Curated annotation (Swiss-Prot):
Name of protein: Large ribosomal subunit protein bL17
Protein keywords: Ribonucleoprotein, Ribosomal protein
GO terms under cellular component: cytosolic large ribosomal subunit
Gene that this polypeptide is encoded by: rplQ
Signal peptide location: none
Coiled coil: none
Subunit structure: Part of the 50S ribosomal subunit. Contacts protein L32.
GO BP annotations listed: translation
Protein family according to the UniProt entry: Belongs to the bacterial ribosomal protein bL17 family.
Entry's Gene Ontology molecular function annotations: structural constituent of ribosome
Record organism: Xylella fastidiosa (strain Temecula1 / ATCC 700964)
Amino acid sequence: MRHQKSGRKFNRTDAHRGAMFSNMIASLFKYQLIKTTLPKAKELRRFAEPLITLAKVDSVANRRLAFARLRNKEAVGILFSNLGPRYITRPGGYIRLLKCGFRHGDNAPMAYVEMLERPIIAEEVT
């Protein structure tokens, strides 16, 4: 029986699941907004928010802990230089999930995963 077992498996091995979420977190930190399925978005929040909390205190030990999870130097740099200082006063809840309909093909529920307080870049209209 699977009582008290938290986390979704997504029909993947443990290594595949870990690599998938590491890549998704790196993309989220780089682009500030990604689109994925709703169950993956909900699970992604469980992995990403503790990393942002870790980045509030910039130390070598915290950078190594973040790198152990992400395995991406660029994402760790963004995490500690941009995101940690941005959320220094926020006690949690750094990520917003926005439902955005269903995927054509398999009708899977989709969602946007967005970093709160992200800078909005105005596009020039010509």
